[in-house]
Amino acid sequence: MRALILLSLGLLRVAVPSPPQVVVYTYKPVVHGEKNTLLCHAKEFNPPNVELQLFEDGNVFSQANQTDLSFESNWKFKLTKFIELIPREDVEYSCHVMYMGKTSIYKLESF
């Protein structure tokens, strides 16, 4: 009986929606004119229906790569979108995160 109660509590925790925690960053410190990787990492979300898109001055990077969706030991998910680029000054880099019908925009702040 105790195992059934613990299982029920665990499933209840999984059933509660949890929005993603998102960070946008570069693999290395930004040096203009040098190749780098722009990443958008979303974690701690459930259910796993999230979409990430990387943008440069409002234009989507259609060739961006994405990791496979995976989950942590707490049954919350994580996903990363990334693209190799040469960062340019005066350009805004951002990640649009679509989750449960809502879009949130996160900007790269390291410039």
From Swiss-Prot:
Keywords: Immunity, Immunoglobulin domain, MHC I, Secreted, Signal. Its main location: secreted. Pfam families: C1-set. GO terms for cellular component: extracellular region; MHC class I protein complex. GO terms for biological process: antigen processing and presentation of peptide antigen via MHC class I. It is found in: Secreted. It comes from the Eukaryota. Residues 1-17 form the signal peptide. Residues 20-111 form the Ig-like C1-type domain. Belongs to the beta-2-microglobulin family. Heterodimer of an alpha chain and a beta chain. Beta-2-microglobulin is the beta-chain of major histocompatibility complex class I molecules. Component of the class I major histocompatibility complex (MHC). Involved in the presentation of peptide antigens to the immune system. PANTHER family: BETA-2-MICROGLOBULIN (PTHR19944:SF62), MHC CLASS II-RELATED (PTHR19944). This is Beta-2-microglobulin. It comes from Rostroraja eglanteria (Clearnose skate). The gene is b2m.
